[in-house]
C-alpha cells in the first residue's frame, strides 16, 4: 500500500471537507429542547405548555424506534398537567415558550386542561425568552458591526473624530469576545499632542574646530601589544620545550633507580666475599708455615722409652750450626719462575692509552714505556699511571 497521497487526491479531500462544512453551516438550526429541566424557574412550568415549537419536534421513524425499542417501552406517552395550587395566582401569560420531552429520547406530548389558566410573572417569561434566544443564536453566525477607525492627524483628532463615540462589542452569551478593533490614536510615542518647536532664528552659531588626531597614541599602544604578544609566544615555546623534556627526565629517574639497585647488589656480594676469605692477618708466607710443620729430630734426655725413634737411620749428623740432625738437609734449589704471557696485557694497555690519554705527547711517552716493559710489575705501573692521567 502506498503511504504517500498525491496532490490531486489531497485537493479532492479538502474540497469534500469544505462542502460538508458549508452544508451544515447553511442548514437551519431548530431550537427544540433548548432549555433543560434545571433551567426552568419553579412556577413557570405550567405556562410553558403548548409551545408552538412542538411543531418542530420530529418523532423518530419506525426503523429508529425499532432499534431503540429493544428491551424498552416504545414511544409516545401523554401527560396531563394537574391544576396549580392555591396562592400561586398572577397575570395570565398569552402563550407558552417550550415543549417538554421525556428522558432517554422519548418524546412526551403534553395536554393542557382547558379549565386551567396559565399563571406566572412577566419577569420570569422574559428571562425564559432571553435564555431561549441566546441558546439558539449561540450557534448562528451574525455579521459583526465594525467600529469606525479614527484616522490619525498631526495636532490631534478633528472635530468630527472627537464627536464619535466608541461602541464596545458585547459577548451576547457565553461565547468569547473578539475584542475591540479600534486602532491606537497615537503613532509617535507616549506624547500624544506635542506641539512642534519652531527653530530659533537669533541663535549664535558655535565655533567648530578640527579634532586632534590620536594616531600616535594608537601606534604606541599597538607596538606595546605586539611586544607583549611576542613575549607571550616566546614563553609558550619555552614551556613547550620544558614539557617535551618531561619524558626524558622520567627515563633518567628510572635508569638511576636501576643503577642504585645494581650497586647495592654488588656491595652485598663484596661483603660476602670478605667474610668467606678474611685474608692472612699474620703476614707469614704459606711456605714457612709448611716448613715449620715438617719432621725434625727430637732429643730426649734421661731415661725413657725410645721405641718411637726410627731404627732405619741410626746415624746422626751435625748441621752448619753443629746441631745434631738425623740426615743433612739438601741444599734448597730455587724454582725457576714460569714465564707469563704478557702479550694480552700489552694489548689491553695499548687500548687504554688510545681511549684515556688525549695529549699526544703523553700518549707517545706511554707507548715507549710499554715497548720497553718486560715484566708484569712494569706493566702494572704503566696501567696505574694511565688511570691517574685520565682522572
From Swiss-Prot:
Region (Interaction with the nucleoprotein): 343-391
PTM annotation (Phosphoserine): residues: 69, 188, 257, 292, 294, 301, 374
Keywords from the UniProt entry: Coiled coil, Phosphoprotein, Viral RNA replication, Virion
Modified residues (Phosphothreonine): 10, 16, 91, 150, 165, 250, 258, 282, 298, 375
Subcellular location: Virion
Record's compositionally biased regions (Polar residues): 54-65
UniProt key word Coiled coil: yes
Record's keyword annotation contains Phosphoprotein: yes
Subcellular location, principal: virion
Coiled-coil residue windows: 218-245
Region: Disordered, residue numbers: 54-98, 145-186
Gene3D superfamilies registered for this protein in UniProt: 1.20.5.300, DNA helicase RuvA subunit, C-terminal domain
Pfam family of the protein (one): Paramyx_P_V_C
Entry function: Essential cofactor of the RNA polymerase L that plays a central role in the transcription and replication by forming the polymerase complex with RNA polymerase L and recruiting L to the genomic N-RNA template for RNA synthesis. Also plays a central role in the encapsidation of nascent RNA chains by forming the encapsidation complex with the nucleocapsid protein N (N-P complex). Acts as a chaperone for newly synthesized free N protein, so-called N0, allowing encapsidation of nascent RNA chains during replication.
Assigned protein family: Belongs to the rubulavirus/avulavirus P protein family.
Subunit structure, as described in the record: Homotetramer. Interacts (via multimerization domain) with polymerase L; this interaction forms the polymerase L-P complex. Interacts (via N-terminus) with N0 (via Ncore); this interaction allows P to chaperon N0 to avoid N polymerization before encapsidation. Interacts (via C-terminus) with N-RNA template; this interaction positions the polymerase on the template for both transcription and replication. Interacts with host RPS6KB1 kinase; this interaction may play a role in the viral replication and transcription.
Comment on protein domains: The N-terminus consists of a long intrinsically disordered tail. The central part contains the coiled-coil multimerization domain (MD or OD). Forms a four-stranded coiled coil structure. The C-terminus constitutes the alpha-helical X domain (XD) that binds to the nucleocapsid (N-RNA complex) and the L polymerase.
Protein name per Swiss-Prot or TrEMBL: Phosphoprotein
Organism: Mumps virus genotype N (strain L-Zagreb vaccine)
Source taxonomy: Viruses, Riboviria, Orthornavirae, Negarnaviricota, Haploviricotina
Gene this chain is encoded by: P/V/I
